[in-house]
From Swiss-Prot:
Role according to the record: Component of the SRB8-11 complex. The SRB8-11 complex is a regulatory module of the Mediator complex which is itself involved in regulation of basal and activated RNA polymerase II-dependent transcription. The SRB8-11 complex may be involved in the transcriptional repression of a subset of genes regulated by Mediator. It may inhibit the association of the Mediator complex with RNA polymerase II to form the holoenzyme complex.
Encoding gene, per UniProt annotation: SRB8
The name this protein goes by in its record: Mediator of RNA polymerase II transcription subunit 12
InterPro entries (UniProt xref): Mediator_Med12
Subunit: Component of the SRB8-11 complex, which itself associates with the Mediator complex.
Taxonomy of the source species: Eukaryota, Fungi, Dikarya, Ascomycota, Saccharomycotina
Protein's cellular compartments: Nucleus
GO cellular component: mediator complex
Family: Belongs to the Mediator complex subunit 12 family.
Keyword Repressor: yes
Length: 1362
């Protein structure tokens, strides 16, 4: 090395490189503010910020040299990578906060820090503040001082030196309102004046005398304030329509309420030494529930809206009170109710705003039955709230469950539908908010249900499905139709002919393609599984009855190949059947087919009947029916074009054929085709009767107003003076069903002169004077009706008198004396057919003149008249058979009570055992009346049989119900077998009949005999009932639960619990108690039995929730407590045991059922259980299992909230010290200094003015130590591991906080605001003023709390993060 080499200078290359490296190293570590870290204030430098846990590197030669030597001697290793070393600790802590133990430790640290802050910031020195004195001023200076007080620019410190004398009480309030002084400055002025007044009173005389003077002054002040309030309220109400006056009144109210200088001590009675202010007493005129007080309450609620929303329990009370007042206003029938519409609108606006901010506040199961309708009328999106409330409601359970069950709601809407149905039917079904699949499946099942018998159901259902198919995916509706067809597993579930007709109608409307069903049936594999043979046979029948005219030819071949395994379809020859049918039709209807060679006497009823039976209707498939009906209608159209008009007999035969073919569309089209061509009055009248008979079905197909108009125009063309009863009934019925058609019908009738009714024969009836001349008319009736060889001809002749009232009376007189016989039945049949009398008069006559117990076959005769098929027995022609059927339908529709009385009487006669045919006779009517008049069915048939101890009537009723339900109960089987059979066959469509059958099983178990027994012939309808013994009832309940434990019942529908809702109350109570006890005492808790029947028990408990007879809170206290503990342990244990969710749901259901007893009982054990339940439910809410189950968590949260709400409304616990009477009797003062409670003793002027940050720390309010506390509501305290804590209400995100964790003292005195419409309305002013004082104290406390250190701010940020 050359030692003489020059050292690097400023211009050398080496020097420049060294300098550049130094510059680069310094630039590499330039301090820049990080982007994602919030800076903290540097206390050492004003305006600078520092960042936690970040120190920039500063070059130090000594440190570098020492580190280099250390690395050379010991080696170098890369330091461990710490991803958060230059960032906030938030990311590293966030993952740890999910561990429950870490959260507990963090909470302890924060709580400790908060206690330290409270101890550090507590002011211990006495206050030095003194109220400013008052001086005497002239009127001019006093006025100037008040103007300065109204000017916000003038400081209060300047004004405090010259507070004028002479302004107090009413003058003070009037001046504050007149000068429009700001509320805060008006409060300062009032407090200064009041403090000087009280200080002057205390200096006078003895201490006790001073207290009396103070009470007198408070009395005077209170009366003054209340007087101003009353005058302002009256002015506000009177000036409601004037904007300027209304604004002034509102300002006056605001000033009065903010001033709020009313004393709590003035709520005592005047006799006790203190006065009561006018308007705050117990008089009805001062309650806020009256309409006059509501505007004031609305003003208060709006003023303190945000603080109210911060407390969920207060929001809930406010929601209840708002809805209660709205329901009162809507129900109250005031003469000046329109004047209250602004108030109703304001309350409705508050309800909507509260729902948007706190939807959980409207979960009020105890009030939902009374207030739910009001809430749903106001809030549009109320479905979820309704569901949440109904899940917890335990009163009026049957009604609640019906509204909750979407399928039942849809069925009730469909049952009430009548054609022509209006456009609102579809909207009503959509408004149920059921899912799309449920709506379609329910409509289709209703259309083909065996429990419904009306013809129009198929057309109504297809019309609704057509509407549903609009605006949805093209495959959505057909897929649901295919799914429904595949779900039909038995012929007993549906009316198979209606099912075929429904499929045909859906194909006509181009909604359904049969090939889709064929492909789905093949892919399902049902036809190839031997154990599903019954299901496969049903599907093959549906397949063989598809309308092949709507099926492609390739699919037709496939269908015929698939059904060939069934013998009926394997040998089916459609061409041969069509040829036989065509020949029979040519004989029956020669005019339609222009058969000149065959001349048949159509007047012969026997020939007509014989020929009609030659048509093999029973052998037809649905496709054959369609072909035959279309060929027949085509032939009729061709015949009408040739000028053919059928006679009455021919059209009656034509109608009968189409009715047997179920071709209702073609029948309606045929009537529309023939009416304009009709020139015969008899035919026109018959067509009118046919239209009236099938009105409901035709109204779904045709334009009924147009058809009725055609009838009337055709009638006018006949130029008849009198109107036939058939046409007149059609006109009257059309006017009722089509109100828009009524004016036109009246016009048509007026233009045709005054209409008069005429008999069938068109012969003018005799006058009254002519009829009264024949005094031997009863004897003539005997000769004509009883001794005549041809009763039909005699009745035709007597038809001339059918409009004569004298003849009707004579006929009833003659019938009253006749004995029951077959000849009398034949006579009555023809009298009804030819309208000589009506079924209503005959039935009413027999019920009046015969005792219900000794009619000697009268009921059987009448039932034969109104129900039995007598066509073959009396050789009725087609027109006669139709007339009789038409009269029966009118009687059943218009007089169901008489019909039911006849059926009830027949149940009490022993002939029912030898005459099973009557079951088929009354089947259709009983199903109709059970659907549309269930209460009447129970009143006239069920109750007279179940209540008395009559085995004959009970057995008859059971036969009837078995026939209607297609069951076989009570024929030598046990109660267990009967119950299992009934429970498995119940559906939403036969629920009422199944409920009646279950009542009968329990009421007459063991007393129903298949053999006839002697019956009581006493005139009374009822017999003294005998109440079953308790042992028998318990045995029956045990049998029921053994049946429920059967593994085959686990897949029962969710509505099967409704089956038990009509049982007697005592029996329902025993079933409910057994269900609860079975669950709570199960060895496999929370499971019950090997197959876990908890889901069945939940359904059973839900349906019987309003039938409590045994308080399990007292009888099963230990089981409830231990069961809840086991549920809590299972919810935090991994893995979770099976059936835990069902167990929690069942426990919640039991808790809600016994809510009143659990929350209001003063028993020591129940009180301990209550605390344990509230705490246990909170623990379940915090458990990981519930957190992963949203639906269960929502139900648990609603239940816990409902229990807490009920807990806040019950009486105080016995161990709490009684507080003084008045609005603060349920408030306690919790001191954070000594951790103790005391009574609230806040005085009116304990706080004189707002704290001023520029004043000294001790220049604060008087008695400041009092506000080192929190005002709490008196509620029970939960104990856990020796630590005292309180459960604070929350919404769905409810939380549990320990005392002292909240840095701000927000008073629960806000509860006085929602109570302003509650039971404490007499003293709502005191609540409000007390709230103001406490809020002032809270602000002072928050001012002192601002001295917190940066460490405490960090702790608060960690708390927010948690």
């Amino acid at each position: 090395m050359n030692s003489s080499a020059p050292s690097p200078g400023p211009s050398s290359r080496l020097y420049r490189s060294i300098n550049s490296r130094d510059d680069l190293s310094q630039q590499r570590y330039v301090l820049r503010p990080p982007d994602d870290i919030h800076p903290l204030v540097d206390p050492a430098r004003i305006g600078d910020s520092v960042y936690p846990d970040f120190y920039p590197w500063k070059r130090s030669t000594d440190e570098e040299d020492a580190r280099m030597v250390d690395n050379l001697q010991k080696g170098y290793a890369e330091p461990p990578s710490v991803p958060h070393e230059s960032q906030s600790a938030k990311k590293s802590i966030a993952s740890l906060l999910r561990i429950k133990s870490n959260m507990t430790a963090l909470s302890c640290f924060i709580i400790t820090a908060m206690h330290i802050r409270v101890d550090t910031c507590r002011i211990t020195t006495p206050g030095t503040f003194k109220p400013p004195p008052r001086v005497t001023l002239t009127d001019h200076k006093r006025e100037a001082w008040l103007k300065d007080l109204a000017n916000p620019a003038v400081p209060l410190r300047k004004l405090s030196r010259t507070i004028p004398h002479g302004i107090r009480n009413k003058v003070l309030l009037d001046q504050c309102c007149a000068k429009r002084i700001a509320p805060s400055r008006a409060v300062w002025f009032a407090r200064c004046v009041g403090a000087n007044e009280l200080r002057g009173l205390k200096r006078k005389g003895h201490h006790q005398m001073g207290n009396m003077s103070e009470a007198i002054w408070l009395q005077e002040w209170t009366e003054c304030v209340v007087d101003v309030l009353q005058r302002s309220s009256v002015a506000f109400l009177r000036a409601e329509g004037e904007p300027q006056a209304r604004q002034t009144a509102k300002q006056n109210f605001a000033y009065m309420w903010v001033v709020g200088l009313l004393s709590d001590d003035n709520t005592k009675d005047t006799k006790a030494g203190s006065g009561v202010a006018p308007g705050t007493g117990a008089s009805t005129t001062s309650k806020l529930s009256s309409v006059e007080k509501l505007p004031v309450a609305i003003l208060i609620i709006r003023t303190f809206w945000k603080p109210l929303l911060t407390f969920p329990n207060l929001a809930k009370k406010l929601a209840q009170n708002l809805l209660a007042e709205l329901s009162k206003l809507e129900a109250d029938a005031h003469s000046d109710k329109p004047f209250y519409q602004p108030t109703i609108k304001a309350l409705s606006t508050l309800v909507n705003a509260l729902f948007d901010a706190q939807p959980d506040a409207f979960v009020m199961p105890s009030k939902w039955v009374q207030l739910g309708s009001t809430f749903e009328a106001i809030v549009s999106d109320s479905e979820s709230t309704r569901v949440r409330n109904e899940a917890l409601v335990i009163s009026d359970t049957p009604k609640t469950r019906r509204t909750r069950n979407k399928q039942a709601v849809i069925i009730s809407i469909l049952d009430a539908a009548r054609a022509p149905f209006d456009k609102t039917l579809f909207n009503q079904i959509v408004d149920t908010r059921a899912d799309f699949g449920t709506i379609i499946q329910t409509i289709l099942a209703w259309a083909v249900s065996d429990s419904r018998v009306s013809v129009e159901r198929v057309f109504i259902a297809s019309h609704l499905v057509s509407q549903l198919s609009e605006g949805v995916d093209g495959d959505a509706v057909p897929s649901h139709i295919v799914q429904f067809l595949l779900s039909v597993k038995s012929h007993l579930d549906v009316r198979i002919d209606d099912l075929y007709a429904l499929v045909t109608e859906l194909c006509v409307l181009d909604i359904f393609q049969p090939q889709d069903y064929v492909r789905s049936l093949i892919s399902s594999g049902v036809l190839y599984i031997s154990r599903l043979s019954e299901w496969a046979n049903v599907q093959l029948d549906i397949l063989g009855n598809l309308p092949l005219v709507a099926v492609p030819s390739s699919c037709q071949v496939q269908v015929r190949y698939m059904v060939r395994k069934v013998a009926k379809y394997a040998s089916y020859n459609e061409n041969e059947l069509l040829e036989r049918t065509n020949n029979a039709l040519r004989v029956l209807l020669p005019g339609v087919f222009d058969s000149q060679a065959e001349d048949v006497d159509m007047s012969s009823s026997s020939s007509s009947l014989s020929d009609s039976t030659n048509i093999p209707y029973s052998e037809f498939t649905q496709n054959t029916r369609i072909v035959v009906a279309e060929n027949l209608y085509t032939s009729l159209c061709a015949a009408v074009e040739r000028g053919y008009v059928p006679t009455t007999q021919e059209f009656a035969q034509y109608q009968l054929i189409l009715e047997n073919l179920h071709a209702w569309r073609l029948m309606c089209a045929s009537i529309q085709l023939i009416v304009p061509k009709c020139t015969q009055s008899h035919l026109l009248y018959f067509l009118a009767s046919a239209t009236r008979y099938q009105w409901q079905a035709f109204a779904c197909i045709a334009d009924m107003p147009a058809l009725v108009k055609v009838f009337m125009h055709q009638y006018r063309g006949l130029r008849k003076v009198r109107v036939s009863r058939e046409l007149w009934d059609l006109v009257q019925f059309s006017a009722q069903q089509l109100p828009e058609l009524k004016p036109e019908l009246e016009t048509l009738l007026k233009n045709s002169s005054s209409p008069q009714l005429s008999p069938i024969s068109e012969v003018t009836p005799q006058t009254d004077s002519e009829a009264t001349k024949d005094v031997n008319l009863p004897q003539a009736l005997n000769d004509l009706l009883l001794h005549s060889s041809d009763v039909r001809t005699s009745c035709k002749m007597l038809a001339n008198y059918k409009d004569d009232s004298q003849f009707s009376n004579q006929l009833m007189t003659w019938l009253r004396d006749q004995e029951v016989s077959l000849q009398l039945l034949q006579t009555l049949v023809f009298l009804v057919v030819y309208e000589c009398t009506c079924i209503e008069k005959v039935g009413d006559l027999f019920l009046q003149i015969h005792n219900l117990r000794d009619m000697s076959g009268g009921s059987r005769l009448l039932l034969s008249l109104i129900a039995r098929d007598l066509t073959q027995e009396y050789s009725l022609s087609t027109t006669e058979a139709f007339s009789l059927q038409f009269q029966r339908k009118l009687f059943a529709d218009q007089h169901p009570r008489i019909y039911l009385r006849l059926v009830a009487q027949y149940l009490f006669e022993r002939e029912v055992f030898q005459d099973p045919q009557w079951l088929d006779d009354v089947d259709t009517f009983c199903k109709e009346v059970a659907v549309h008049h269930p209460a009447l069915f129970s009143q006239l048939i069920v109750d007279p049989v179940i209540e008395p101890d009559n085995a004959v009537a009970a057995s008859s009723l059971q036969q009837l119900l078995n026939h209607l339900l297609k069951l076989d109960l009570g024929t030598g089987t046990s109660l267990a077998d009967d119950l299992q059979q009934l429970i498995t066959h119940v559906t939403p469509f036969n629920m009422f009949l199944a409920q009646t059958q279950l009542r009968l099983l329990f009421a007459h178990r063991g007393r129903i005999s298949k053999d006839p027994v002697a019956m009581d012939t006493s005139p009374e309808l009822t017999i003294n009932s005998t109440t079953p013994s308790t042992d028998t009832t318990d045995e029956d309940v045990s049998v029921l639960f053994r049946v429920l434990s059967d593994p085959g019942l686990l897949k029962l529908p969710p509505f099967f619990g409704d089956l038990f809702s009509e049982l007697p109350g005592e029996l329902k109570g025993r079933i409910l108690a057994r269900a609860e006890t079975t669950f709570l005492t199960s060895p496999n808790f929370p499971r019950v039995g090997e197959d876990n029947i908890v889901s069945l028990l939940i359904e059973l408990a839900d349906s019987l929730a309003d039938s409590v007879t045994e308080d399990v809170c007292k009888t099963q206290t230990f089981a409830l407590s231990s069961g809840l503990q086991r549920l809590v342990e299972a919810s935090v244990r991994e893995p979770h045991p099976p059936g835990l969710a069902e167990g929690i749901s069942m426990f919640l259901k039991i808790a809600m059922i016994h809510e009143k007893s659990l929350m209001a009982s003063e028993d020591a054990e129940v009180t301990m259980l209550r605390n344990h339940v509230v705490e246990g439910l909170q623990a379940l809410l915090d458990s990981p299992f519930v957190a992963t189950t949203p639906d269960l968590k929502a139900t648990l949260q609603d239940t816990w909230t409902a229990l807490k709400s009920e807990l806040s409304e019950v009486a105080e616990p016995a161990n709490s010290a009684p507080s003084k009477a008045g609005p603060t009797r349920d408030l306690l003062l919790y001191s954070t200094a000594n951790d103790a409670f005391s009574e609230v003793t806040v005085r009116s002027f304990d706080l004189l003015e707002e704290s001023n940050p520029t004043m000294g720390v001790n220049d604060a309010a008087l008695n400041l130590a009092l506000f080192n506390a929190t005002i709490e509501k008196r509620i029970p305290i939960a104990w856990n591991n020796g630590h005292k804590r309180q459960l604070v209400d929350g919404g769905r995100g409810g939380r549990k906080t320990a005392r002292g964790t909240d840095s701000s003292l927000v008073p629960t005195i806000l509860e006085g605001i929602p109570r302003c419409m509650d039971e404490y309305s007499n003293h709502w002013e005191l609540f409000f003023c007390f709230y103001l004082y406490t809020m002032r104290a809270s602000e002072v406390h928050d001012l002192r709390a601002n001295r917190a250190s940066s460490f405490e701010r960090r702790a608060s940020s960690v708390e927010l993060l948690a």
